[in-house]
A protein has these predicted regions:
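N-terminal loops that bind phosphate or other acidic moieties
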Residues: 1-210
């Protein structure tokens, strides 16, 4: 999967696959920690539902110092990874990586795996959901429209300057281009926008705004 390759290309020693419906366990994370050659290991959960499992690995990893960064989305994880500096100490890296992550807003588009009610919003199985920084803000049937609305919701005028539309296995480059062009028109010429083939399952779009 492209996103796994990306994380490895920017310096990750081990990538544990996960997603909305298949979150890795503490054992999965612990095995990944022990598979790295480093004495100090940074764990980037990139999903709020994985943070607790990651934190449980801290006391179980013998001979390793484990630091769990509170990254809640894949774009936050990418920005944090790009700030890692091999010449800096662990504290400096942790501060720089978290500062980078906190500057990233994330819109995600997925579907409901079953009928449910989330934060008081009734959702039917198969319905499209737009998440803004992990919270459901939009539901409906039009994937591209929900992607656009969700990204606009997290865009900060006069602060945001880069929009990256990462499209998944069940979406096309043409769809991503259409979403990107609508966002570019809405957000203005000073914003740099691009599309990336993420190939990820479950999420039709993951949109990074920073």
């Amino acid at each position: 999967e492209w996103l796994e390759e990306l994380f490895k290309d920017i310096g990750a020693d081990v990538v544990v696959s996960g997603g909305q419906t298949m979150n890795p366990s503490t054992d999965d994370i612990l095995n990944a920690v022990m598979a790295t050659p480093a004495k100090t290991v940074f764990v980037l959960p990139n999903n709020k539902n994985i943070i607790m499992a990651a934190e449980q690995s801290i006391n179980l990893a013998e001979g390793r110092e484990v630091r769990v960064l509170q990254t809640k989305t894949i774009p936050q994880g990418i920005s944090a990874m790009l700030m890692f500096d091999e010449t800096a100490d662990a504290n400096e890296n942790q501060m720089a990586m978290m500062e980078a992550a906190e500057n990233v807003e994330t819109a995600q588009v997925t579907f409901a795996a079953r009928d449910s009610e989330i934060e008081g919003v009734p959702i039917k199985q198969g319905e499209i959901m737009g998440l803004c920084n992990g919270k459901i803000k939009y539901t409906g049937n039009d994937i591209k429209d929900i992607a656009y609305k969700s990204a606009v919701k997290v865009f900060k005028k006069n602060q945001s300057s880069i929009i990256t539309v990462i499209y998944g296995a069940d979406t096309t480059e043409a769809d991503a281009e259409e979403v990107k062009n609508r966002l570019a028109e809405k957000c203005g010429d000073e914003v740099e926008s691009s599309i990336v083939n993420g190939g990820q399952p479950i999420y039709y779009f993951i949109i990074s705004v920073e």
